[in-house]
């Protein structure tokens, strides 16, 4: 077994959910299920015991040694127009690392698991990281009632897969875990610009996501004076700029990712505007005040137009730090391979941020060509994928060998 196997597996997995030049493998879709079935066969072919837990997480277990397991993982669900590396490198790279240790004849002192967590992306049902939330024992009951654009609920899809929504709490397994490592593409330009081969993650930013509704008044686009309008889109514009200024001032990011306008006609002033908001920040102190900041900023921005504001917070995950000991182990593994490395934060959310508060956790990044992700143009060079597997395997061997 060689590290190059991960690139072969990435190409195979990309065939599930092919959509033109992109990958569309939404959580709980048929393409997602077919991909998990293929992955289960890969796990079993590598000598792992594969099983789908009550939350839809697929886990391959190398039942060796004793004590708590070291878990390597990420996700294989995707957004609507995705590339082939986001999440999948962490799962297939984890499998490749296990196969490297097996080929070397390593006999682990602890069990090793490879996990593909359910619905990390959250794009279909509007809430992310269901699988890792259930895995660590969070109450995910509210998630089950969420519906996609076609009106299908998570609970309905679970039943279609042969899973019982009432048993989702049985997916909790964190008490059996001693450490977690996640290999991932950077999804940004820092490593490539710096000419570095790997990034050792020091922490993951906190994230608040919300759905915002602004209500004004529909009226004639030609006969209503500008100073007599309650235009919901004008409120959106003011709010977007104000949120951007607040994010820049705090070293964070604010993104309005989707917008819906009613009634949506050339000749009618918009009566309603709904939009999604994603606000991220690295400081815990700043994060703790983020909900109030969003409320205050949006409401103040909409006052000049006399708009009614409704804000529903859909997700809130605080920033987390990575485990210093495993971070150092990853650095040593990179150094043994002669790889250039740098410490860096993660601006993206990952399953690791749910697991880090419970067990020692670390993440390893490899470069993203052009810093592009969540796009068919997403690309990580094959040699960087292979190097990531080698560094991961080196750290894993140090932890369990």
Where are the predicted features?
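N-terminal capping segment at the start of a domain
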Residues: 1-29, 317, 372-374
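Zn-dependent metallopeptidase/amidohydrolase metal-coordination segment
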Residues: 6-9, 14, 73-74, 341-391
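A non-catalytic alpha/beta surface segment that caps or lines the substrate-entry region
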Residues: 18-63
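A short beta-alpha structural unit
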Residues: 24-28, 255-265, 276-283, 308-327
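A generic, well-ordered mixed alpha/beta core segment in the N-terminal half of proteins
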Residues: 80-150
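Midchain, well-structured core segments that form catalytic/ion-binding scaffolds
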Residues: 119-120, 124-285
């Amino acid at each position: 077994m060689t590290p190059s196997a991960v690139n072969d597996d990435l190409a195979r997995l990309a065939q599930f959910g092919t959509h033109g030049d992109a990958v569309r493998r939404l959580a709980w879709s048929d393409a997602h299920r077919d991909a998990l079935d293929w992955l289960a066969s890969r796990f079993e072919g590598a000598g792992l015991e594969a099983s789908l837990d009550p939350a839809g997480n697929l886990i391959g277990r190398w039942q060796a040694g004793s004590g708590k397991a070291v878990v390597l993982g990420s996700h294989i669900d995707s957004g609507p127009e995705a590339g082939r590396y986001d999440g999948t490198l962490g799962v297939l790279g984890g499998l490749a690392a296990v196969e490297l240790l097996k080929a070397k004849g390593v006999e682990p002192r602890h069990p090793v698991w490879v996990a593909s967590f359910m619905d990390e992306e959250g794009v279909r049902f509007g809430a992310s990281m269901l699988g890792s939330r259930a895995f660590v024992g969070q109450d995910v009951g509210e998630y089950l009632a969420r519906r996609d654009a076609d009106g299908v609920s998570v609970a309905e899809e679970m039943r279609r897969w042969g899973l019982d929504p009432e048993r989702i709490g049985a997916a909790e397994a964190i008490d059996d875990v001693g450490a977690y490592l996640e290999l991932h593409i950077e999804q940004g330009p820092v490593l490539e610009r710096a000419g570095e081969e790997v990034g050792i993650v020091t922490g993951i930013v906190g994230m608040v996501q919300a759905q915002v509704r602004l209500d004004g008044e529909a009226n004639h686009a030609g006969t209503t004076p500008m100073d007599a309008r309650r235009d919901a889109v004008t409120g959106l514009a003011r709010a977007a700029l104000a949120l951007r200024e607040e994010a820049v001032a705090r070293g964070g990011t604010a993104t309005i990712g989707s917008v819906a306008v009613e009634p949506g006609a050339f000749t009618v002033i918009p009566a309603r505007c709904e939009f999604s908001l994603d606000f991220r920040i690295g400081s815990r102190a700043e994060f703790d005040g983020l909900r109030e900041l969003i409320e205050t900023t949006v409401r103040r921005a909409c006052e000049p137009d006399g708009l009614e504001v409704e804000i529903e917070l859909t997700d809130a995950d605080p920033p987390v730090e990575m485990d210093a000991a495993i971070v150092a182990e990853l650095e040593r593994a990179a150094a043994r391979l002669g790889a250039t490395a740098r410490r860096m934060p993660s601006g993206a959310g990952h399953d690791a941020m749910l697991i880090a508060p419970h067990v020692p956790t670390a993440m390893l990044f490899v470069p993203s060509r052009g810093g592009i992700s969540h796009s068919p143009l997403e690309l990580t060079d094959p040699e960087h994928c292979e190097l990531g597997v080698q560094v991961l395997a080196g750290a894993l061997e140090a932890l369990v060998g």
